[in-house]
């Protein structure tokens, strides 16, 4: 998990430094729009409830959330057609990259992704070319430190969890099969654990450490270029950054 975590930290730091709040709001708004197709009431729509929780955590204004729901559910004639598309490819050094996009024009999105990959030493591949290198799983982040590890273990015995990872920030990441996200986070809440966030994630089964710093820098530039594309919703990679790497 070391390299995966480092990439997450780099993304978080970049987001804070660049203050790209508008882009974040737009991205989350699209998630809400797609989720709202299954119903505008979050009480009966877990996907929508999850997207709204993410929006609130990011500070998205209530008005933005309401408009995104209206677009997805067709309220007031505002329905917008967005589709979820997964793209797969390789970065420099054979690093696997999996991109999830929300798009109203798949030809445009594919062209933009193909250009970004080619400009930064990678290539966009066929569906399935790298997804087998990842596990699509449920992840729930809770408040838990080492002192509560035994209690957490006891709780997980009665839940559909595959395991957990304790962080050094007073939090733990509980993970399980893809289909149990709703029941897993509900079960943790019922056992009085403070749930911070929950999501579906592509977790790398193996990781790739580039053999030289220049390749690592190329990979990071590719990931940054992909993240800057409007249609890109999330990026997963099996890149592992060496501890000695200097940006």
Swiss-Prot record:
<dbReference type="InterPro" id="IPR017856">
    <property type="entry name" value="Integrase-like_N"/>
</dbReference>
<dbReference type="InterPro" id="IPR002876">
    <property type="entry name" value="Transcrip_reg_TACO1-like"/>
</dbReference>
<dbReference type="InterPro" id="IPR049083">
    <property type="entry name" value="TACO1_YebC_N"/>
</dbReference>
<protein>
    <recommendedName>
        <fullName>Probable transcriptional regulatory protein SynWH7803_1972</fullName>
    </recommendedName>
</protein>
<dbReference type="InterPro" id="IPR029072">
    <property type="entry name" value="YebC-like"/>
</dbReference>
<comment type="similarity">
    <text>Belongs to the TACO1 family.</text>
</comment>
<dbReference type="GO" id="GO:0005829">
    <property type="term" value="C:cytosol"/>
</dbReference>
<keyword id="KW-0238">DNA-binding</keyword>
<dbReference type="InterPro" id="IPR026564">
    <property type="entry name" value="Transcrip_reg_TACO1-like_dom3"/>
</dbReference>
<keyword id="KW-0963">Cytoplasm</keyword>
<dbReference type="InterPro" id="IPR048300">
    <property type="entry name" value="TACO1_YebC-like_2nd/3rd_dom"/>
</dbReference>
<dbReference type="GO" id="GO:0006355">
    <property type="term" value="P:regulation of DNA-templated transcription"/>
</dbReference>
<dbReference type="Pfam" id="PF20772">
    <property type="entry name" value="TACO1_YebC_N"/>
</dbReference>
<dbReference type="Pfam" id="PF01709">
    <property type="entry name" value="Transcrip_reg"/>
</dbReference>
<keyword id="KW-0804">Transcription</keyword>
<keyword id="KW-0805">Transcription regulation</keyword>
<dbReference type="GO" id="GO:0003677">
    <property type="term" value="F:DNA binding"/>
</dbReference>
């Amino acid at each position: 998990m070391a390299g995966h975590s480092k990439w997450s930290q780099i993304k978080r730091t970049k987001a804070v430094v660049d203050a790209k709040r508008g882009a974040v709001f737009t991205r989350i708004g699209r998630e809400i729009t797609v989720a709202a197709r299954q119903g505008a009431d979050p009480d009966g729509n877990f996907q929508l409830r999850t997207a709204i929780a993410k929006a609130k955590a990011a500070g998205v204004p209530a008005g933005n959330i309401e408009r995104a729901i209206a677009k997805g559910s067709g309220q007031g004639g505002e329905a917008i057609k967005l589709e979820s598309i997964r793209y797969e490819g390789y970065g420099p050094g054979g690093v696997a990259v999996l991109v999830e996009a929300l798009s109203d024009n798949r030809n445009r999105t594919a062209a933009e992704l193909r250009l970004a990959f080619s400009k930064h030493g990678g290539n966009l591949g066929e569906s399935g070319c790298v997804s087998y290198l990842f596990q699509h799983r449920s992840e729930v982040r809770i408040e838990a430190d080492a002192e509560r590890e035994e209690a957490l273990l006891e709780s997980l015995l009665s839940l559909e969890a595959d395991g957990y990872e304790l962080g050094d920030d007073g939090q733990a990441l509980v993970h399980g099969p893809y289909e149990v996200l709703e029941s897993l986070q509900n079960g943790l809440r019922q056992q009085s654990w403070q749930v911070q966030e929950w999501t579906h994630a592509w977790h790398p089964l193996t990781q790739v450490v580039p053999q030289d710093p220049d390749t690592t820098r190329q990979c990071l530039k590719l990931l940054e270029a992909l993240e800057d594309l409007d249609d890109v919703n999330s990026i997963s990679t099996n890149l592992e950054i060496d501890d000695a790497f200097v940006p």
